[in-house]
Amino acid sequence: MKLQLMICLVLLPCFFCEPDEICRARMTHKEFNYKSNVCNGCGDQVAACEAECFRNDVYTACHEAQKG
């Protein structure tokens, strides 16, 4: 269970406005549905997965802001 949580937290560097494609590549081992922007779960660490979804919204918005 601790290992799953650690894996969930691997995404943290994406918070710092990395390009979208890098974040997506970093997330390929996760159960995250980008097309619908929905977390399908991260093992039994649902809260951690929901936090990832929130961070995804934040860095996607940041990336969009960088384009402008």
Curated annotation (Swiss-Prot):
Main location: secreted
Localization, UniProt: Secreted
Keywords for this protein: Amidation, Disulfide bond, Secreted, Signal, Toxin
Signal peptide: 1-17
Transmembrane segments: none
Cysteine pairings via disulfide bonds: 23-53, 39-49, 42-62
Coiled-coil annotated spans: none
Keyword Secreted: yes
Tissue specificity as recorded in UniProt: Expressed by the venom gland.
Gene Ontology terms: cellular component: extracellular region
Domain of life: Eukaryota
GO MF, one annotated term: toxin activity
Residues that bear Lysine amide: 67
Family, similarity comment: Belongs to the helical arthropod-neuropeptide-derived (HAND) family.
Swiss-Prot/TrEMBL domain comment: Is exclusively composed of 4 tightly packed alpha helices (no beta strand is present).
Protein purpose: Toxin that paralyzes insects. May have a direct effect on the insect central nervous system.
Note: Arose via modification of ancestral neuropeptide hormones (ion transport peptide/crustacean hyperglycemic hormones (ITP/CHH)).
Official protein name in the record: U1-agatoxin-Ta1a
Annotated organism of origin: Eratigena agrestis (Hobo spider)
